[in-house]
Amino acid sequence: GLENHTWLYFAVFTGVIVGLILEPVPGAVVAMVGISIIAILSPWLLFSPEQLAQPGFKFTAKSLSWAVSGFSNSVIWLIFAAFMFGTGYEKTGLGRRIALFLVKKMGHRTLFLGYAVMFSELILAPVTPSNSARGAGIIYPIIRNLPPLYQSQPNDSSSRSIGSYIMWMGIVADCVTSAIFLTAMAPNLLLIGLMKSASHATLSWGDWFLGMLPLSILLVLLVPWLAYVLYPPVLKSGDQVPRWAETELQAMGPLCSREKRMLGLMVGALV
């Protein structure tokens, strides 16, 4: 069976998991409290009696080294950097501008509007490692305004006019693009870390992208069309969506300096 200190460690670990699920405080606070408890009580939670009895064993230094070991993990820093880019996309309005531009150019036909949603996700995905933030925070606030332009309402027969197709594409495009890029979703990065610790094999951003490229091309090109065929919208074309997108872009004004800097940082990071 497990040793006593391992069981105590497991108890604290379980408490952290429960805290992350229930979220009485933000998740970062729960994690820091858990790390602090284990580091402070390390003689009873982290190390066995045999380790503590070794000559020259300094549990204080070992505890501190364990507590900050995550900061030396390159995967953690990659996740952090990608989240910062995602926040920048949202705060500067660059993500919204890109999506509106594609909707304006491709929104005359419902099928092309589906491709606009897919391409918007495709552009945002490499630097937004949260599919929830990308889909719900950037894409959804835009596409939810499109169906009412054609009197297509949820929970109503009019939803099949265009709304159902657009919302379905929002969900599917989010899922597809999350698998294409290593930095499109945080679990992808964690998976690389687990793979490295288990098999000592490494997989770079380029390796992931090239491995997914053949399937990615098929998914990006076929999914909007398949959804259009299998779940066809009643409305096939219209001019209201492009006009609305153009109005929104005019309200945003020209590309500001913050957006230009964000775009430059994004291109530089990807290169």
Could you tell me what each predicted segment is?
Residues 18-26, 120-130, 172-182:
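Transmembrane alpha-helix interface/packing and boundary motifs in multi-pass membrane proteins
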Residues 29-155:
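Membrane-embedded alpha-helical segments and adjacent helix-loop junctions characteristic
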Residues 2-4, 15-33, 43, 67, ...:
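Flexible hinge motifs at transmembrane-helix junctions and intramembrane kinks/re-entrant loops
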Residues 91, 131-134, 150-264:
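Juxtamembrane and boundary regions of transmembrane helices in multi-pass small-molecule transporters
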Residues 2-3, 46, 60-69, 190-207, ...:
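Transmembrane helix-loop junctions at the membrane interface of multipass transporters and ion channels
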Residues 1-11, 72-81:
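Structural signature of hydrophobic alpha-helical transmembrane segments
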Residues 1-5, 102-111, 155-161, 251-257:
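Short, amphipathic, aromatic/basic-enriched membrane-interface segments that mark the entry/exit
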Residues 11-18, 117-123, 170-173, 265-270:
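Hydrophobic, membrane-inserted alpha-helices
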